[in-house]
Amino acid sequence: MGLPDSIQRYAPELWDSVRPLYDAGRYAEAADRGRELIEARPDQGFLYYNVACCESLAGRTADAIEHLRHAIDKWEGCREMAIGDSDFDPIRDEPAFQELVGR
């Protein structure tokens, strides 16, 4: 998904239950499951980023931007990653996304 392996290795097992949904294109379900994980582990910035990716692909623009904002708050590197991450293509032209990533 979005974050590099070096970041995901901190708690990859958290995303293991969601990854198959993402891989199957079931983005709304993946986002919903990811939100449950965030409730359990709000300290894990990669969860916010990956949920934002799923929400973007599921057409949940406002939710995607909000979760990306949280991810960036937890790790500034998410801002640069989001610029080139194709998961954000559906929302890339949104003013809120542009403002968030500084474009």
Regions found by a protein language model. Give the residues of each.
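Canonical tetratricopeptide repeat
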Residues: N50, G84-D85
